[in-house]
Regions:
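NAD(P)-dependent short-chain dehydrogenase/reductase
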Residues: 163-229, 235
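Glycine-rich NAD(P)-binding loop of the Rossmann-fold in SDR/ketoreductase-type enzymes
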Residues: 89-100, 150-151, 233
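Catalytic helix-loop patch of NAD(P)-dependent Rossmann-fold dehydrogenases
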Residues: 128-179, 183, 200
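NAD(P)H-binding glycine-rich loop region in Rossmannoid oxidoreductase-like domains
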Residues: 54-96, 125
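Conserved glycine-rich Rossmann-like NAD(P)H-binding loop of the short-chain dehydrogenase/reductase
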Residues: 27-38
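N-terminal Rossmann NAD(P)H-binding glycine-rich loop of SDR-like oxidoreductase domains
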Residues: 5-25
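Conserved Rossmann-fold NAD(P)-dependent oxidoreductase catalytic core, especially the SDR/UDP-sugar
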Residues: 99-150
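Mid/C-terminal beta-alpha module of Rossmann-like enzyme folds, strongest
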Residues: 229, 237-304, 320
Length: 325
């Protein structure tokens, strides 16, 4: 039976990638892509796509989507880049919008599966984190002042509470799968989308504009603390995981997975070698000051919002063992 897939965040990096991959499958009839941004030329070229331009926090999309009877909901949308001076608006978009997505998934009879993209950030980057400790799904998230980590933690809590409430009422609920990805990378992320990210900056791929020129200058070396480390997952692996969770019968009602390879992480010397640069050793206080300075002087155009400096300064590594099994 052909599936109808509803992707929230259909104009984003992951959402558009999944839209493309689903459109190539014979067992998919329709992909409904929702995003607050306009549909890209690439997305317009894809078959089977119904595009709805709306913010997930709005009340304008639910009836339109419901009439297509989606059986799988994949929530990839997020305003990741912090909005300077607009924290309440951002919270409404992200947390409030996610609540509406969850409410739709639990109240629409056709929905059989809900896949939610969460984050590694909500494990919290702290001074006492160690390279040797890999956070597992069972440890759960920790409180953090970094707005992205805080919002994602609250949204996961809301999702689980919504699930528990529905189960207690004896309602039929979709199978829920939460994925917490490492940093997603690959050729699509590097070249098909304009992304203001760590790899783009270090590789010198940011083009045009005074802000991008400043960032490129600042990353002529790889500035790194002793605790700097990253985990990456290839976009093809993300796609394969989502396809597996979408099309195969899974033996759970609600489950959470770190999606990260069971392999060595990328340390600062590794990153420097990969981008052909040298490491510039710095202290955490230097990162904190730089992040504060550029956040306020550029009014958020350089994405260094409060508390995000800790994720550049201290290790945060996940275990991928649960998924590997």
């Amino acid at each position: 039976m052909s599936k109808t897939i509803f992707i929230i965040g259909g104009a984003g990096y992951v959402g558009e990638m999944l839209t493309h991959q689903f459109s190539l499958r014979d067992d998919v009839d329709t992909i409904i892509a929702l995003d607050k941004e306009p549909q890209s030329d690439f997305s317009q070229s894809l078959d089977k796509v119904i595009y709805i331009q709306a913010n997930m926090a709005d009340e304008t999309w639910q009836a339109e989507v419901a009439k297509h009877n989606p059986d799988t909901v994949i929530h990839t949308a997020w305003q990741i880049r912090a909005m300077y001076g607009q924290a309440d608006k951002q919270w409404d978009w992200n947390v409030g919008g996610s609540d509406k997505v969850f409410a739709f998934a639990f109240s629409t009879p056709s929905v059989q599966k809900l896949i939610y993209f969460s984050t590694a950030s909500s494990y919290s980057a702290r001074k006492d984190n160690r390279f040797s400790h890999l956070f597992t799904e069972e440890e759960g998230f920790r409180d953090d002042d970094y707005i992205y980590a805080k919002e994602k933690k609250v949204s996961e809590e809301h999702l689980y509470a919504k699930y528990q409430e529905a189960k207690q009422k004896g309602q039929s609920v979709p199978q829920v799968t939460v994925v917490r990805p490492a940093a997603i990378t690959g050729p699509r992320g590097r070249y098909m989308r304009i992304r203001f990210g760590l790899q783009s900056a270090l590789q010198g791929n940011l083009k045009g504009g005074i802000v991008n020129r400043i960032v490129t200058l600042l990353t002529s070396f790889v500035p790194a603390t002793k605790g700097w480390v990253r985990q990456f997952i290839h976009e093809d692996d993300v796609n394969d995981i989502v396809m597996k969770f979408t099309f195969e019968a899974m033996p759970w009602d609600y489950n959470v997975f770190n999606i990260v390879p069971v392999s060595e992480p990328v340390f600062a010397p590794d990153m420097a070698t990969a981008v052909g640069k040298k490491v510039l050793p710095i202290q955490p206080w230097m990162a904190r000051f730089a992040f504060w300075f550029f956040w306020h002087t550029t009014r958020g155009r350089i994405p260094t919002c409060p508390s995000s400096w800790r994720f550049y300064s201290y290790p945060l590594l996940m275990s991928g063992e649960k998924l590997a099994k």
